[in-house]
Amino acid sequence: GGAEATANSPVVQSLNVSTTTVLRCRTYADGSYPSEEIIRTYVFEQQPSLAAVFVTTDPLSMFSADSGLYMTGNSASMMDPKYGANFWSNRELPVYVEMFEPGSPKTPAFGVMGDFKISGQYSRAKEKKSFSVTLREEYGNKRLKYPLFPDYPELKKFKAFSLRNFGNNSGDDYVRDRIGTQMTEGLGVDYQHGRYVIVYYNGKYYGIHDLRERNSEYYYETRYGLDPNDIDLLD
């Protein structure tokens, strides 16, 4: 699943769905423009105690062995972190992102189009990778208007957000990264709010990730209402 609906896609009148499935649908008629594409994820999983994030995108663009953004590709070095691999590219992919909250498993809390980009440093070579999603006006949504972090309902407008693989600790623990961040709460310094979520790509389970505020000029828009064009970030 995940491939964009085109005029060459299979035509269906009705469809029975019994496993977790992503559907991308569009109507075509002679002499008319194609309809807007509708993307929906149908979930047949045991209700988790964590929120679930479903990422839908063209499967070849993401997972093709040769050119997929998530994959090693043909130009990577042998040693980690495999410089030259596809996942070191700055390329972005259009994705559709849905989020299901634990208490409302039947209806997504939101569904938005955005640009997907692999992030991180050495942990890019891990099987599970960190990534960011950035909303674009060209997709119809300049901002995500939803409180991503239930403990902080005042934060409800986001240009971008990150889903981390827990960095170099990925696969070893899921605690250190979050605790290290949360310990700064109350110290009067800025830090990224976060929460644990599970992630699916095109309906396939990809494990627990750390949903975070994106560390960029838009962080200050969300937190303080500042114009991101007035922010200069220095590394």
Predicted regions: what they are:
Residues 1-115, 137:
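Short, compositionally stereotyped local motifs that mark structural "simplifiers"
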Residues 55, 76-235:
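Conserved ATP-binding subdomain of kinase catalytic cores across diverse folds
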